[in-house]
């Protein structure tokens, strides 16, 4: 519980959106009840309220919005993963970095032999275990093929990117919009930075990178939806996150 904290999401809705603000508000109420009403209740916001609470939001085409609560990682994702590994080590687990699996094979006694390789030295050896858990994310199918495991389903890949820029607002609140193509679009506070995104594009391979088109999409959409003294430009990008 100490790893997460409540944070408010602030959603602005523009004219022409596919649902009225009241409909979205009712959805947020259902979401709140599913969470046993543990957080602060959602609010239905007028255009005037949005201007008062978050003047950085462009309300020129606004029909109102909602404010609701969700949770976020206090330590952010990188530190969270590191702490997870540290706790696992204390519990008796063994963790190995830069080690890749070359496939697993089940033996006659029902145990598994997994061939692994140190990617820094090239050394290879085998590890015996009672079970093998394939938690390779987008590389699950590839790992299954190395182990001659077949299933009914295959992964379909979608790429999302975020851009990290200087902090846009002083309030610890996630700004939520709907981009030009209708997808959810966030401006997330993270320390003295703001993380903006995301895109959602179908790709054929899990290895991805940020393209000029990705940057242009994010920049155009955020500049339309916030009132800044100077519109964000590519030179304002401090770092990029994608996957």
Residue ranges: model-predicted function:
Residues 7, 11, 15-18, 61-71, ...:
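Conserved Rossmann-fold dehydrogenase catalytic segment
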Residues 51-91, 95, 113, 126-127, ...:
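Helix-loop-beta segment of a Rossmann-like dinucleotide-binding subdomain
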Residues 87, 99, 118, 224:
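Flavin (primarily FAD) cofactor-binding/catalytic cores of flavoenzymes
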Residues 97-113:
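A conserved short coil-to-beta-strand element within the FAD-binding core of flavoproteins
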């Amino acid at each position: 519980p100490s790893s997460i904290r409540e944070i408010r999401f602030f959603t602005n809705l523009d004219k022409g959106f596919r649902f009225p603000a009241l409909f979205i508000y009712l959805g947020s109420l259902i979401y709140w009840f599913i969470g046993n009403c543990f957080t602060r209740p959602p609010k239905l916001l007028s255009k005037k309220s949005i201007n008062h609470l978050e003047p950085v939001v462009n309300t020129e085409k606004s029909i109102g919005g909602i404010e609701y609560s969700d949770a976020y990682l206090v330590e952010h994702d990188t530190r969270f993963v590191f702490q997870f590994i540290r706790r696992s080590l204390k519990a008796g687990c063994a963790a190995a970095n830069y080690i890749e699996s070359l496939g697993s094979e089940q033996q006659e006694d029902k145990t598994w032999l997994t061939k692994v390789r140190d990617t820094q030295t090239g050394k290879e050896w085998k590890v015996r275990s009672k079970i093998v858990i394939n938690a390779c994310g987008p590389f699950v199918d590839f790992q299954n093929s190395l182990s001659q495991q077949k299933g009914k389903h295959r992964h379909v890949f979608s790429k999302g990117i975020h851009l990290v820029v200087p902090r846009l607002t002083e309030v610890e609140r996630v700004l939520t919009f709907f981009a030009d193509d209708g997808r959810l679009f966030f401006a997330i506070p993270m320390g003295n930075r703001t993380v903006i995104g995301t895109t959602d594009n179908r790709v054929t391979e899990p290895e991805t990178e940020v393209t000029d088109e990705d940057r242009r999409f994010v920049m155009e959409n955020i500049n339309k939806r916030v009132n800044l003294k100077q519109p964000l430009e590519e030179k304002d990008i401090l770092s990029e996150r994608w996957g």
